[in-house]
Amino acid sequence: MAELIPHPFGSLINRMFDELETEQSIFDFPAKKFFCGISGKDYSVNFHGKISSSALGPASGPQTQMAQNILLSWLGGCRIMELKTVQILDELEIPRPCIDMQTVGYNVEWSQELRIEQSLHEYVKGAMLIEILQASGKLELADNFGDVLYDMSVGYDLAGIQSDKVRQFIEGMQDASAIVEHYRQQIPEQYREFRKLDFQTKLSDTLTLSTFHGCPPEEIEKIIDYLFREHDLNCIIKLNPTLLGKEKVRHLFNEILGYAEIHVPDEAFENDASWEQAQGFVERLGETAKTLGLGFGVKFNNTLIVENHRDFFPQSEKVMYLSGTPLHVLGIHLVQQFREKFGDQFPISFSAGIDKTNFADAVALGLTPITVCSDLLKVGGYSRSSAYYKELNSRMDKLGVSDIESYILKAYGNAEQALENIASGGVNTSGTEAAAVDALRKTLENGGEFRKVAGAQEEPLANEIFEKWLSEVKLLNTKTYVDEVTTQARYTLEKNSNPPRKVGTTLELFDCLTCDKCIPVCPNDANFALNIPQGETEILEFENNKSGWSVKAKNSLKLEKKYQIANFADFCNECGNCDIFCPEDGGPFLLKPRFFGSLETFQEFSHRDGFYIESVETSAQESTVFSRFDGKEYRVSETGNTVNYSGPDFDIQFSKNDPANTISGEAKSRVSFLNYEIMQMMRTSYESTSRHTSG
């Protein structure tokens, strides 16, 4: 229905615990694929003076706009949540579909798809869900894997960011006390012990600025200066890959990587900040941040604006935004270019084509946070991130290290050269500073925790020397990796040109291939399995004439699969991602049974077929089923053994156990029981799922 509807907080809690208990999953994420840290491994990093248990996070995008998305990201091992960008224009019409992951990644999304206030509430709900789940003790969470940070994101121009709407959002993120208390009261009675939790109310004091492609550099500088002074925020500027310049972007992208058919329009370079302009505002804003005692950094990088040369998005969209695998090469070159100018003076956040293979490389460069979007939209969804840690662990084990700083120092074998560089750059080689360098060198040779060794030295500058060493290694690692990544075939067109396989059949309401790919690729958890028993159901067709009602035909509905695929409309924004990976044509989000979360949404989105199950409080009456087939509405309600079934041209009653001999009522034409039987199946199967929980 292309509009996201936030779910009641109590229902989210009920479902979270019920599903974990009965199905060993949370929001369709199997518990066996959770990543909860590993004893003996310390992935923690520093982000604006605070500790996060890992540098990994979801990028500002589809994985961070609803409460359940944030929890799902956390279950996959993400610990720095870059929340989806909000802006004053929060009622945009976004083209559908809006995500194309057939090969690399393209999108035509902008910012949040919720109202600003809704976004704020979803972020608070997501954080509270994480705290409740942690406090429950139901997960075997490693001791050093519980620290999570939230990074807000706003856009896109100064006027919008200075508006009351956005100001209230920022203030709400800095002090969410009232919202936390609101949702504290909604924690279900059976989980009342969690009402006593000391929930985090200062959700964030960090912000990543997202600007329009083409935002003037002076506007960027004014925005950050405003956020520094008005809101006392640690800030990061998300910069565009066009900073590399027209010649270098096209050389890398079109020639080296081979994406010849993809064209970055000249306007993208002409309208965006140039490298020289970016250097200027980074230097000035860095000084301002230092004066104010705030953190400041940059992020590489934003998506790459390209001409819409494909037929996936509406032709009205003249440009689209590229993400995913090839963007990684551009992003790493930008990191190198930036560090050649600024060294390790400013922290760098990174989001460009991160996956299980290169996450460990990004960690080795000392990038924080390292955020991912496109890869988590592929088969497996949020569970893909556990493989990131598998590769990182493998490399750490080979190096004999257990913490991130030690891993950075040893990852590419640049530590000895870095020591020589800092020794030749001003260390007193005859004094205690030299002793500190020697101690670090011995630790490099014999093993041990480098920071502890530095801290144990009598030389007061030992820790400073360690920091210089670590920074120098980051710079050398960047040079090493940029050379490697530019020549790796995995980023080329040849390796990224095959779309997911299609089998040539079209989806129907029931009995698809049930490959389950559509369930995890939905970042909102809109698609799910519906347990309807296999078998054949008799379908009666009645006619009412002068002699009364009679059966005129008998047909059957046969279900051959062990379960069916369905869609929860309130969580579905019709992005189209599930259609990309479904082997059949048509789109699960369009053709599979669609369930609405309320009668209001069922009625509002009347252009979509689907079902709404209205719960009742009495045992004497069954829930009422509202449905729409081919745009026509039907209703089934039961009291005792009596069924009331109505449609566009009939309103009948009958005994549930013997409809053929008890049917009565009015009808203008024959009445088939096909839709009735389907509605009964939907009622029984949906009410048995963990999704059907009251708040």
Residue ranges of predicted features:
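Catalytic cores of alpha/beta
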Residues: 67-75, 222-225, 340, 354-372
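Glycine-rich phosphate-binding active-site loops on the catalytic face of alpha/beta enzymes
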Residues: 77-90, 239-241, 361-391, 426-468, ...
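Glycine/Thr-rich beta-alpha phosphate-binding loop at enzyme active sites
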Residues: 25-39, 246-344, 379-393, 397
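Flanking helices and flexible, charged tails adjoining ferredoxin-like Fe-S electron-transfer domains
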Residues: 461, 467-470, 484-498, 537-693
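Ferredoxin-type iron-sulfur electron-transfer modules and their immediate structural context
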Residues: 398-401, 405-571
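C-terminal helical cap(s) of enzyme catalytic domains, especially alpha/beta-barrels
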Residues: 91-110, 315-317, 377-402
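N-terminal capping/small domains of soluble enzymes
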Residues: 1-232, 677-685
